[in-house]
Amino acid sequence: MGLVVEDFPKELLVDIVKRIERTADRNSVSLVCKRLYEIDREQRDFLKVGCGLHPATEALTALCLRFANIKKLEITYFGWMSNSGKQLDNQGFFVLCSNCPLLTELTLSFCSFINDNGLAYLSSFPKLRSLKLNFAQSISSNGILSLVVGCKNLSALHLIRCMRVTSVEWLSYLGEFGKLQDLSIKYCKGISEDDQMKLGPGWNNLRHFEFNTVNITIWTHGCIHLSLLPHS
């Protein structure tokens, strides 16, 4: 009599599922049987969602409830148009924050309807270590400040094309009280090279720094842990 999935030990099935990297493949495997579905539900710790999330809030809620151990989440609306359905907004973002207690890494790209009020919900994530914002046109310096004050363990912050981020009070706060090791600021017109000095003593903790017009000879001084400094 041949073996069926139910005959295999759970440890073996977990190892098999972990080795499947493509999301589409994992989705297919989870449909094979209830046991693989449950293992995938328990083991999946990364989600990438975007324009196909419709209706956005309800769909994301369902995903978060199914995959309760999500640690890394990427939401991208690149290529979004008004006829693609509604984007995730502040209300939906609040639902996200209520259902992903283990979240440590978050990427928001082209999310036009999440503003400073929505970003403030992230302060409820004590484990959040990494935030990447790409083309976040509704988020300003105030939102970034509330984020860094609330997220005490933030060690990586990437800001790309965030045009409303201008004042750098948040950078001063990170320099004094933060644990920042990875800082990337690209194409944020409101932040100049001189503004980087606001990081102050925080420079000594940096291991990776990226700024689109940085002068290397200025910023490497005193950064004893800095290992990577790309520039353009």
What does each model-identified segment do?
Residues 203:
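Compact interaction modules built on cysteine/histidine frameworks
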Residues 59, 82-83, 151, 160-170, ...:
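Leucine-rich repeat
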Residues 206-209:
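Extracytoplasmic/lumenal domain signature
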Residues 76, 109, 134-135, 158-161, ...:
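Per-repeat beta-strand-to-loop junction in leucine-rich repeat
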